[in-house]
Structure formats: structure tokens, C-alpha cells
Curated annotation (Swiss-Prot):
Organism of this sequence: Salmonella schwarzengrund (strain CVM19633)
InterPro entries to which the protein is assigned, alphabetical: Ribosome_maturation_RimP (IPR003728), RimP_C (IPR028998), RimP_C_sf (IPR036847), RimP_N (IPR028989), RimP_N_sf (IPR035956)
UniProt protein name: Ribosome maturation factor RimP
Single GO cellular component term: cytosol
Gene Ontology biological process terms from the UniProt entry: ribosomal small subunit assembly; translation
Lineage: Bacteria, Pseudomonadati, Pseudomonadota, Gammaproteobacteria, Enterobacterales
Pfam annotation, one family: DUF150_C
Family: Belongs to the RimP family.
Coiled-coil zones: none
Function, in words: Required for maturation of 30S ribosomal subunits.
Assigned keywords, A-Z: Cytoplasm, Ribosome biogenesis
């Protein structure tokens, strides 16, 4: 997670939780039109009105604090079936599920891995890939998503 993403997470966690939602994570994607993507969840699931409520509240906070120096679009959504993973707690919660990982730095000459989440030990994640356990530092995981099965 970048320094900006950490700062944004700290700023918006309380307002999101005050509305009764879990802040799953955020992504800031820089580009011609940058995007701040916020993922929320709740035990009852998420609908469009929930996203609108959070968007309104978070927009107010961001307008006051103004932490982003470039123009951006704000997107608020549920994590979806291919839920992104951001914290060790997320991996622990979905232990036994299949995950696709993209690493910051290659391990065994590979940056992309896919397997079953076997264990979480502090900041280390064990994933079973093709019958073999591989251990990854959470800090080396650039992107991770659950792999949905239909």
C-alpha cells in the first residue's frame, strides 16, 4: 500500500465505519483520469444506496482534507466475487479459498501466483500452489484477489 493509500485509509475509515460498513480497502490508480476506488462491505451485503451514502460522506471528508493533488474520480463498490485482499485478516478470513497474487518482486522468477490460502502467520501468507506450499510476505504482494468458482 502506498503512502497516499495509507493516509487515505486513515482518513476515511472512521466515517465509513460510522455509517455501519467495513472498509475493505482502497486503491488509487494514477492515469490520465486518476481513480480512487473504495471497497466496502457489511454483513447484509452492499447495494447502490449504500455506495451512494459512503460516496457522499467520503467526498465531504476528502473535500475538506484535500489529500489528492490531481483530479480523480471516486468509485465506491462492494468487493465483488473476485474480492480484493488487502490485510492479513482478509487472508485469514478466506483461508481455504483460491487466491490470485501479483507480487512486487518475483519469487522463483515469478510475479504471478495462484493457489489455495493455507495459513496466515503475522505478515506471512502460505499459499498451496500445485501441491506445494509457498510463503509470501504480505509486503511483497502488490495485488491479490479471490478466484470465484461458479
Amino acid at each position: 500500500m502506498s503512502t497516499l493509500e495509507q493516509k487515505l485509509t486513515e482518513m476515511i475509515t472512521a466515517p465509513v465505519e460510522a455509517l455501519g460498513y467495513e472498509l475493505v480497502g482502497i486503491e488509487f490508480i494514477r492515469g490520465r483520469t486518476s481513480t480512487l476506488r473504495i471497497y466496502i462491505d457489511s454483513e447484509d451485503g452492499i447495494n447502490v444506496d449504500d455506495c451512494a451514502d459512503v460516496s457522499h460522506q467520503v467526498s465531504a471528508v476528502l473535500d475538506v482534507e484535500d489529500p489528492i493533488s490531481v483530479a480523480y474520480n471516486l468509485e465506491v463498490s462492494s468487493p465483488g466475487l473476485d474480492r480484493p485482499m488487502f490485510t492479513a485478516d482478509h487472508y485469514a478470513r478466506f483461508q481455504g479459498e483460491e487466491v490470485a497474487l501479483v507480487l512486487r518482486m518475483a519469487v522463483q522468477n515469478r510475479r504471478k501466483w495462484q493457489g489455495i490460502i493455507k495459513a496466515v502467520d503475522g505478515e506471512m501468507i502460505t499459499v498451496t500452489v500445485e501441491g506445494k506450499d509457498e510463503v509470501f510476505a504480505l509486503s511483497n504482494i502488490q495485488k491479490a484477489n479471490l478466484v470465484p468458482h461458479f
